Amino acid sequence: MAQPQRPYDALYDPNFTVAGPRDHYRQQTMAGGFNIERAPVYNNFFSELPHHPPSTLRLKNADRVPAFVDRNYRPAANDPNDTRQRSDALAVSGPNRPKYFRRPMLAAAEIHIKQAPPSQLPPLPSHQDLNATAPAAMGGAGGLGEPRSKTIGTQSDYRENEAQTAPWEPGYVLPAPGALTAKQAALMRRYHTDVPEVLQLKDLAFPDGLPAGLQEVTRIDKMRAKRAFEASLPPIDDVARLPLRQRMIEEWEAKEWEEREQEILSIQDKRLELLDNALQVREEELDDENRLRVEARKEAMLAGRAGKFADVQATRIKTMRQLIENRKYVEKHRKLHKPTIVERYANYGSGTYAPLQREGRFPESKPLGKEIETEGYAPVTLKGVVDLESFLPSRLLNPRVAAPQKPARLDYHQRKEAAVQRDLKAINDLLDTAKGTAGRGFGDCWPAPLQDDGGAGMGNGTLGRATSTVGKGTLGAGGSAGGAAPGGASMALLGGPSTAAASAMGPLASGVSGSPSRRVVRAIERPPTPELPQPPAVTAPQHAAVVLLQRLLRGRAAQNIMYEGRVRRQELIDELRLEEVVSADGTKIDGQPIRRPEHRDTATLRIDALVGSAVAEVAAILAETDPERRETLLAGLDVSRAHATAAAVAAAAADINASARAEAEEAAATAMAEAAAAAAAAAAAAAAAEDGGAEGAAESAAEAAAAAEAAASAAEEAYAGAVAAAAAPARAAALNLEALGISPEEAEEAAVRIQAAFKGHKARKEVAAMRARGEMLRNIMANGDEAKVVTCQAAIRGHLARKRVRQLRASQAGNEGFAGAPSASPEPAAPLPALAENQDQQEPQPQPQPSSSSGALDLADYDDHHGEASAAMLGGEPSLAVGGSREGEQQLEADAEAEAEAEAEAEAGAEAEASAQAGAEAEAEAGVEAEAEASAGAEASVGAGAEGDAEAETEAGAQAEPGPEAEAEAEAGAEAEAENGAEAEARLGGEEEGFREGEGQGGAAAGEAGPGGELAEGEGEAGEGEAAE
């Protein structure tokens, strides 16, 4: 059997075997050569910080092994027997190999091994195995000895989670340069690596760096940037560019050192913040402990004070009572005598009227249930007394007094019987006392000794219980005790010898008899049910009515309770009864068909989708835990609503422009018709002049000629207006801008910037109001309940609807004023777009909608549809007017596609546009002057260059990306353009200003968002040309 190992077997036991030097020294360590003790750190002696502990742990040498004992590892010599046995370990293979495995030994029953005599040892098998079931025996033909060590069994002490290591990762094979796919080659060229990029992350392991987070992603980006930088360095063999390479490397290293310093500073700031929080928490805990201690002390002192007050009050009351009692006998001496019954009844403060309790009971009161009710029997009149006396027998009214007789002398048997009766009476009195005080019985059910009535000459051997009749003076043996006749009880009182002897022998016979005693269980007598006296016959109907009313009230109360419970659980009841009302096929409820969502019309589905998306957006924003992100999302929600309103206003303006153009064309046609009618009238007058008189014909001819001249002039004016309206783009293109050194594209870009500056100025005011309303809404939603939140949401929707109606009305009024301008100026409101012809050929784009299933709202969702609508609104995109309100949705989709293409072109030419940014201010001023000189054609120029406006808008956003210098330069140019735009707008006509006012209100919020759909820093700088990234 395996013996327990001792601490120093590795040093002293020559047979102790280990696998190697590591296990040898590990056994010495496990022997307990060192003890751990706690040592103070005096520099941090009073510190409570976790990273500056006041004490530490150190090893204390407690080794008791002498110094001359060798601690080195001395491996045992290699034994050929062990080598042979290990070599033959794999001799058994195939399906029979598991039969020779040894299982781990379990501590079950004891194992008794009996050594067999040498002559009966079995022969050595030809193949041996270290894992064989039976160890190999010594001896044999080869003369091999027993190996030095044996493997009894192996079983791990560790669980799976403790033995778990890093997850296994498969190996990889680097492909040959010629075997790379096009994608792999493109990725390697893109990230400047000779091997797959994932191999650059070999140092990331699961405990450290994996799964990847924000820091790992930042690290990967830095590695990519560094490889790109190294690839962009001049070659090292270029001697002429070595200084440039050195300077670039130094700048890069300086940048890395600066980033590292910033990272270290941020880490230190975080540590300081954690320390500050820990100190604050500690101070709060100390304050709480001090407060609790003070409160406990206060409560203890208040309790002590209250106890002292109670003691003083009790002492005061006792002293006052003694003084009052002593004051009674100042003049009159106190008589110390027991009050008589008359005095006790005369004094209403005596114990007769107010008895004192002892042990919770009134000793002089009658026991419970033994009171005598005399209310219904005591006479109250003289006639009642007479009737009572006539009813009572005379022996109760006339007491009979007899002289006491001299007791007769008793003989021996009578005295013995009397002694037995006294003993029985004493036992009976004890039992009655126990019954009345200790509660050992109830009624007649109280314990009593059993008597054994068996025996010769004493009856049939049945058991009886001694009973007593209190107050009657009789005591019988009960049952058939002693086989006595029914008159045995009276004979006992008369002192008969047989009865006395039987009574005397009763207890003895009970003790001597060999029959076992049994327990007699009596039925428990319940107290009688109390009954109320019958009401008089006169009040019987009233009593019955009161009882009926009480029953009705109780029934109604029970019904109200049942009704309240049913109402409170009505939803659950309806849910449980849903199976009863639903038809078998699941298509009807109570006979009515179930209206499925897929059966609704397109308009209802669209409205439900919009309402659901809006509610989901608000719920997602309110569920956001970060206050800053919640404010950003709310601002983005307001911007998206403003974008939608701007798109609707643009569509309404397009409808108004279309109607104005239709009215102008109708007026021109009417004028042409009038001119034709006048010509016909002139011809008729000429014919009449030939047939009629000369004078009348001359007058008619003159009138007809005048009418024809007036109609011709009106038609000529109408035709000139139509021609001017059609030629407005040509006149705008024919402006002599080249003489000023300004190309048409630059003029359009300057016009867009002026308009954006004007609208950005109004957008700042609108956004300020939106932020104020959003802050108030957030406060209400953060502090209110669900009903208030729902009310606020309904108020927001109503406010947005009313605002949209006001903007539409203002835009309609402005366009109506602008449509009336041709009477003063022949220029129409806007030229007809050429895009209307190819509208049917465009493929409709899917309308993007905010996701209502996501938990968090992303502002990037507004990048495509809201940002494009706002860009078209700011640039005066005439394509929004195509098709009117009926085709506005398709046109918005086409504008979104055109805007995406323009944005891609703007990003491709960002570098070329950056060089032209310096002259933007001069170009804007020149454009303003040109627009002021040709105010009649300025609006047409802006409308004709709608695509250029959108491109300039996106180019302005692209130019804001390169760096802080470009942003500052763009901001300065935007401010100058805003001032010039304000001056130019001030010089324009009243009709144009009104139209721009309505358009600016419609697109006010659009100036606050950049191409990314997010809010810009500041108060609406995005509307001035600086797009938010």
UniProtKB/Swiss-Prot annotation:
Keyword Coiled coil: yes
Cross-referenced PROSITE patterns: IQ
Coiled-coil spans in chain: 272-299
One Pfam match: IQ
Region (Disordered): 72-97, 117-170, 837-861, 876-1029
Biased composition (Acidic residues): 890-910, 922-932, 964-982, 1016-1029
Superkingdom: Eukaryota
Biased composition (Low complexity): 837-854, 911-921, 933-944
Basic and acidic residues bias: start-end ranges: 984-999
Transmembrane segments: none
Keywords noted in UniProt: Cell projection, Cilium, Coiled coil, Cytoplasm, Cytoskeleton, Flagellum
Keyword Cytoplasm: yes
GO biological process terms, semicolon-separated: cilium movement
Cellular localisation: Cytoplasm, Cytoskeleton, Flagellum axoneme
GO cellular component, one term: axoneme
Cystine pairs: none
Ranges of compositional bias, category Gly residues: 1000-1015
Family (UniProt): Belongs to the CFAP91 family.
Subunit structure: Identified in a spoke-associated complex containing CFAP61, CFAP91 and CFAP251; the complex is associated with the radial spokes of the axoneme. The complex associates with Calmodulin; the association is calcium sensitive. Interacts with RSP3.
Chain's role: As component of a spoke-associated complex, regulates flagellar dynein activity by mediating regulatory signals between the radial spokes and dynein arms.
Name of the protein in its database record: Cilia- and flagella-associated protein 91
Source organism per UniProt: Chlamydomonas reinhardtii (Chlamydomonas smithii)
Organism placement in taxonomy: Eukaryota, Viridiplantae, Chlorophyta, core chlorophytes, Chlorophyceae
